[in-house]
């Protein structure tokens, strides 16, 4: 599934871009299920967050996003790869990003196929946002 920015995330991202003097950082989270699928009306409480041993929420520092680049009409920013190394088992369906302070959902994406993690695995996620 493609990345989806729900209505709540659209409002928050526009505020961050255009009116927030000091926008809050974001958090990257993994999920095991989402109630009703990812839709325009999704909110953060629809997601069941991962709980495997070794899991942690990844704080996304605003200054760490790579410089924007444009290719074939799409301008993209990426965030350096984030990894998790579980020491217990859990199936991960995708990731979602929340605003750091209020925890509001900004965007979410399901993986092409779920990932059944076991001890010794590494799960890597590289965020990429594009506008065209």
Predicted stretch roles:
Residues 1-94, 99-132:
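Small cysteine-rich, disulfide-bonded extracellular modules of the LU/uPAR three-finger superfamily
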């Amino acid at each position: 599934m493609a990345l989806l920015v729900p209505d709540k995330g659209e409002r928050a991202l526009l505020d961050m871009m255009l009116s927030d003097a000091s926008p809050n950082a974001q958090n990257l989270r993994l999920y095991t299920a989402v109630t009703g699928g990812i839709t325009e009306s999704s909110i953060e409480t629809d997601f069941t967050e991962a709980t495997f041993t070794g899991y942690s929420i990844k704080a996304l520092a605003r200054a760490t996003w790579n410089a924007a680049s444009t290719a074939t009409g799409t301008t993209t920013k990426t965030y350096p790869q984030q990894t998790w190394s579980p020491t217990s088992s859990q199936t991960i369906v995708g990731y979602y990003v929340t605003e750091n302070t209020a925890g509001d959902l900004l965007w979410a994406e399901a993986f092409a196929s779920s990932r059944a993690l076991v001890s010794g695995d590494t799960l890597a996620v590289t965020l990429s946002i594009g506008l065209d």
